[in-house]
Each structure stands twice: as structure tokens, then as C-alpha cells.
């Protein structure tokens, strides 16, 4: 008998009887080699044979009840993975299936990129830190900081939520200066990027040597979003300092979530050599309060200005082999409850002025 883990063995022919040689072998054991010139090239399951003992010679034989063929139940080296096969491609996120593959060929370590380090800061004098009394009517709980932190962590970033900074220029500048010295790859703030008197982020980051790449884009929600590179001017060797990516997101929670999904996360994918997400496609369902009829099979679901890209929370469903999606009707950049009941975003492209039931739309996962 040959068991799994045994060294390969050589089997000699039975010269006395002249009968073909067979060997009992366990799953995972190496096939034996024959010194008689006849290759042992087939394995028959134990369930498909009967062992017969010759009472005269005490020799054991097997009787096979099912047809056998060459290479049956035999696994050859290289029949699964071959030399030069790619197990994990550059830019892929390592998942358990990759671990199964690399471990099976004896690889115990693989080179990976480090997680991007991200600092998250909420701005707003009206915000309450977590755990404080919510009874004052002029204060609200900070929703953006925890949401941004949780989403970024789920997407593979190493995130530090650094708290709330009030709407005052000097404390805000000091806080960002301190964060810049800690070597983060990306800094994200929420709030204070629009056009109000206390929207201080654009002016403050310019005082910190920021190179603003864009501020205010043609998208809804999230129009005020800002992206900049902040140069570290503290280098003492005359060489250019490192640049830190900075995203200023709007304060309205759903607008902040949209900018995170369609501005920040694509940038993090770029840092990690990953491909941007491609949209899936789904058929748009009519609203619950609209009844289709023979006279109006494809009612208008929603209308748009058409001068910018619009991202709307939606609920995707599968039905009869087709992916269908329902637009969340009760939407507002500042209302969180409708967002809670969504699981995807619909991208309404610039130039589209209306969507009708039955239209095929682009959808993206919520994060």
C-alpha cells in the first residue's frame, strides 16, 4: 500500500504468476513506477473492485467491475498550474481565492503595495463629536466623518479620523499643517468648500502652498468638491518636497458620499495601480406611485437639467434574468434616510434631460 506522503516506490513484475501488477494506493499518494516496462497509468476506485484471495497461493487479486481507461483518476504535475502562469496580476486586490492558489504552489509571501494612509477631518462649528448630548437644537451629530472612515476602510485604506475642526481660519490652518507633517498620502475634509463666508477650506489650503487642480465641477450632488496637491515646503536639501493629495468634500452627507464614490475612490484605485470601475447596466423601473398602462408604457421617471453629470441613489433588483433598478424619488443632498435604503448609484450622463421606465442606465455599487 502507498499512502499520501510516502516516497515514490518502484514495483517489480510478478514473474512467478505473470499476472499484471496492481498496487493499493491512497488519494494524494504518488503513482509508483514499474521496472518491468509496463507503465502503471490508471487508478480504479476501491468501490469499483472486489478483492479475491487465492486459497492455494494466498495471493490477492482484484476483479474490476467498471471499464477503466488510461490516466483515469491520475493527476499529473502541471495539469493545474503551469510554470509562468500568473496567479495574482499587478493591481489586483488579493482575495482568499488568490491565497488558495499561491499556497498550493508553495508560495508563502507575495509582494503587495502598502495601504494608502488617509486622514479624515470633519469641519463645522455646528458638529457634535460622537457621544455628546444631541439636545442642543443648534448642533448636529457628525455623520460624514464616521461614514467616510468606514467606507474608506472597507475599500482597503488605512484611515485615521482626526476629529472635528470648527469654522475658524487659523485653527483650521494649524490642524491641516499638523496633519501634513504626519506623512499621509491623502487628506480628506468634509464641509467648508462652497461659497459661503465660513467656507474657508479653499483659502486655507492656498496658504499651505496648495496647487488647486479643480474646484467646483459639473456634477450633482457634489458640485463644490475640491481637489488639490499640497506641497511640503519643509525640505531642507533643496529638493522638491512631497505632495499630499487633498480632497475637500461638501458638507451635505449625500453630496459628500457621491464625491467620495466618484472622485476619491477612483484616485485611491489609481494610487494602487487598479483599474477604474466599469458601470453595470440595468433597466429602469417606474416609480411605485406610477401605474403603467397601454397608453403610457414608458412613463417619465425623472427629469434633469442636462448640463451636468448627475448621480442618484437607487435600489437595484434582479428579476427574470434582468437587472432592474428603481430610482430613489425622495432625494436631497442633505437627507440621509433615502440613502439608507439604496444599494447603488445611477449615473445620469450630461446631456440627458429625462429618464423613462425601461431605459437602460449605468449603475455603480454604493462604494
Language-model segment annotations:
Residues 1-108:
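Phosphate-interaction motifs
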Residues 2-5, 14-18, 36-37, 54-57, ...:
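Solvent-exposed alpha-helices and their adjacent loops that cap or buttress functional pockets
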Residues 24-26, 65, 89, 120-123, ...:
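Short beta-strand segments
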Residues 27, 123-124, 184-204, 211, ...:
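Glycine-rich beta-strand-to-loop/alpha-helix junction loops that act as flexible
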Residues 35-42, 99-100, 130-134, 172-174, ...:
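Short acidic, glycine/serine/threonine-rich loops at helix termini
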Residues 73-189, 194:
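Phosphate-binding glycine-rich loops and their immediate beta-loop-alpha structural context
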Residues 204-367:
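Flexible glycine/proline-rich
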Amino acid at each position: 500500500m502507498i499512502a499520501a506522503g510516502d516516497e515514490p516506490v518502484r514495483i517489480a513484475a510478478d514473474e512467478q504468476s505473470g499476472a499484471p501488477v496492481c498496487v493499493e494506493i491512497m488519494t494524494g499518494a504518488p503513482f509508483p513506477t514499474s521496472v518491468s516496462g509496463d507503465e502503471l497509468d490508471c487508478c480504479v476506485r476501491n468501490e469499483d473492485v472486489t478483492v479475491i484471495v487465492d486459497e492455494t497461493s494466498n495471493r490477492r487479486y482484484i476483479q474490476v467491475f467498471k471499464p477503466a481507461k488510461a490516466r483515469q483518476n491520475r493527476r499529473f504535475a502541471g495539469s493545474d498550474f503551469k510554470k509562468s502562469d500568473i496567479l495574482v496580476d499587478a493591481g489586483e486586490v488579493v482575495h482568499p481565492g488568490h491565497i488558495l492558489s499561491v499556497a498550493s504552489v508553495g508560495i508563502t509571501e507575495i509582494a503587495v503595495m502598502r495601504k494608502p494612509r488617509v486622514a479624515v477631518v470633519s469641519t463645522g462649528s455646528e458638529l457634535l463629536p460622537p457621544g455628546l448630548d444631541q439636545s442642543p437644537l443648534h448642533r448636529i451629530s457628525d455623520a460624514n466623518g464616521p461614514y467616510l472612515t468606514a467606507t474608506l476602510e472597507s475599500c482597503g485604506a488605512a484611515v485615521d479620523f482626526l476629529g472635528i475642526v470648527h469654522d475658524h481660519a487659523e485653527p483650521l490652518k494649524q490642524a491641516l499643517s499638523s496633519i501634513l507633517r504626519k506623512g499621509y498620502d491623502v487628506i480628506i475634509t468634509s464641509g467648508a468648500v462652497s461659497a459661503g463666508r465660513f467656507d474657508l477650506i479653499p483659502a486655507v489650503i492656498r496658504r499651505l502652498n496648495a496647487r488647486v487642480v479643480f474646484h467646483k465641477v459639473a456634477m450633482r450632488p457634489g458640485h463644490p468638491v475640491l481637489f488639490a496637491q499640497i506641497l511640503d515646503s519643509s525640505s531642507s536639501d533643496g529638493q522638491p518636497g512631497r505632495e499630499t493629495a487633498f480632497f475637500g468634500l461638501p458638507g451635505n452627507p449625500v453630496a459628500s458620499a457621491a464625491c467620495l464614490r466618484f472622485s476619491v475612490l477612483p484616485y485611491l484605485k489609481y494610487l494602487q495601480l487598479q483599474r477604474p470601475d466599469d458601470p453595470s447596466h440595468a433597466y429602469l423601473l417606474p416609480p411605485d406611485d406610477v401605474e403603467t398602462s397601454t397608453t403610457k408604457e414608458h412613463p417619465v421617471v425623472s427629469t434633469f437639467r442636462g448640463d451636468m453629470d448627475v448621480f442618484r441613489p437607487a435600489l437595484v433588483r434582479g428579476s427574470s434574468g434582468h437587472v432592474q433598478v428603481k430610482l430613489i424619488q425622495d432625494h436631497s443632498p442633505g437627507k440621509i434616510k433615502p440613502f439608507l435604503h439604496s444599494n447603488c448609484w445611477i449615473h445620469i450622463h450630461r446631456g440627458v434631460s429625462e429618464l423613462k421606465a425601461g431605459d437602460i442606465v449605468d449603475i455603480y455599487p454604493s462604494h
